[in-house]
């Protein structure tokens, strides 16, 4: 997949604005009003978009989908993106949120709950710290610690997390009614949301969201008749009594260790000898993908490129851009071997390529709610790329990776414009993914975020057909001719017409009439409440 600086987004001719009424919290003595605010689009990377200049990239990999297999599960940082960098005026003690095994001789191993004095936190994502328990100095991943005795250090605090991601976690198999988490409110600055797993006869398993409001004097409440000095006291109260909630709080929602930002301190350009290729996962036009180990300690995915695929100098420059793109739904780039044969090291994902997962893995048995949720996750990642003014250029199931609990991440970005292969750069050559490409991009090379939207419509057909090749029975040239004449794929068997209507919006001839990824994400996240509330499982979907 390629991410490039895109043209300025124009307002579409059709305005896609879902209604987002936010119901006020009921402060009566009975059951509390549940927060029904529509999930806002959230990004794991905050702040202004980086200006990486105008780039022109082509997608990596061709039709066979040579993609790195990224991480075993989604990670949500429960720590703010940064803490105050000054350590003067008193020492702040930090506490470990997770266990960590050292990957290099410069790292510190530690256990959850261990306390640290931070020596230097001004050099990025890895901080120099001293363990109070052992007295040892070393580097620690900054997103594995939080200030001791802070809200961020509480096990139930999940920080910046959207409503939909909270629901995904709480509804994971094995979780029981009453399991909960606290997160920042998406709709009210300075407020929090309490998300609880519930069950009822009508909806079955579901999640209720309650807004935790802040008093002027610093206290907290869900209803004004029950106010608390601290968030910790509020949580403790509702673990003892439901007191108007749908259920009393039982246990904290399980989470997983977040991915570290990079493999270790200054581990970016790494020696080839530090990597061990162990299991070949796939191959394609331009290289192979392996599961392997870095430094004898860390499981990774390794993409090996055939010599001559791209210039090493250009690749290294591009990789500097790739590693700056950070989002929960993008596979992170960890490190590179920049001399030929080029190696690209990324997060390892346990379930592999989405296309294979749908055709040969457990994905064969998924029903429409799971498939729509996977599409919503992909739209979430693409909405981030949209906000960053980049484009993907090769969005399809072969470039999406799957982890535990059906977590999906977008892979393979930033490389394609560097590929030196006539069968690819010709756009209509054998290695170019014509069936996924918008006509203006295939015919005239006009790649924009709106051509990505077209590709997303095709990807939706891959999901609901469990990996069927688009335009069955048609060869590439025929597809291009028919699409130019106005042909669009019919509604796949078992697919609701409302979902097919979204596909057709993505396939509008005029790129400006196609929806934004922000709209697509919102539509898919609320699909079974706003669009198809009467859905009943069928034979295949």
UniProtKB/Swiss-Prot annotation:
Single biological process term from Gene Ontology: cell surface receptor protein tyrosine kinase signaling pathway
Keyword terms: ATP-binding, Cell junction, Cell membrane, Cytoplasm, Cytoskeleton, Kinase, Lipoprotein, Membrane, Myristate, Nucleotide-binding, Palmitate, Phosphoprotein, SH2 domain, SH3 domain, Transferase, Tyrosine-protein kinase
Chain ranges of the Protein kinase domain: 275-528
Binding locations of ATP: 281-289, 303
InterPro entries from the UniProt entry: Kinase-like_dom_sf, Non-receptor_tyrosine_kinases, Prot_kinase_dom, Protein_kinase_ATP_BS, Ser-Thr/Tyr_kinase_cat_dom, SH2, SH2_dom_sf, SH3-like_dom_sf
Record note on modification: Phosphorylated. Phosphorylation by CSK on the C-terminal tail maintains the enzyme in an inactive state. Autophosphorylation at Tyr-424 maintains enzyme activity by blocking CSK-mediated inhibition.
Phosphoprotein found in the keyword field: yes
Stretch list, region Disordered: 1-29
EC number: 2.7.10.2
PANTHER family, sorted: TYROSINE-PROTEIN KINASE
Protein name stated in the entry: Tyrosine-protein kinase Yes
